[in-house]
Amino acid sequence: MAAKTGSQLERSISTIINVFHQYSRKYGHPDTLNKAEFKEMVNKDLPNFLKREKRNENLLRDIMEDLDTNQDNQLSFEECMMLMGKLIFACHEKLHENNPRGHDHSHGKGCGK
């Protein structure tokens, strides 16, 4: 799937895959994220993710351990997508936070704003 073709959602999916591989190919196995790759991805491509926690190193370690379901100290694409799913859900909830219409359907400030 080319980045310039397809629907907005298809392009978004392609972007997520491409960003994952941008980091997974740096060291070790080309299809998993090690701790350094995961940390770099979160710090560079999810800069607002740990904004409140001030990029707490222990929190990053704990998140990776929680996602690493097979305990191989690597995150597969599937394991990493568990984080993306949780972030998307949290962002969706934040969009509706303090909105008098709730989920009936107006959006406030999104994630990272």
Swiss-Prot record:
InterPro entries cross-referenced by the UniProt entry: EF-hand-dom_pair, EF_hand_dom, S100/CaBP7/8-like_CS, S100_Ca-bd_sub
Cellular component terms (Gene Ontology): calprotectin complex; cornified envelope; cytoplasm; cytoskeleton; extracellular space; S100A9 complex
Residues modified as Pros-methylhistidine: 107
Binding site for Ca(2+) 2: 68, 70, 72, 74, 79
Domain EF-hand positions: 13-48, 55-90
Function summary: S100A9 is a calcium- and zinc-binding protein which plays a prominent role in the regulation of inflammatory processes and immune response. It can induce neutrophil chemotaxis, adhesion, can increase the bactericidal activity of neutrophils by promoting phagocytosis via activation of SYK, PI3K/AKT, and ERK1/2 and can induce degranulation of neutrophils by a MAPK-dependent mechanism. Predominantly found as calprotectin (S100A8/A9) which has a wide plethora of intra- and extracellular functions.
Protein name: Protein S100-A9
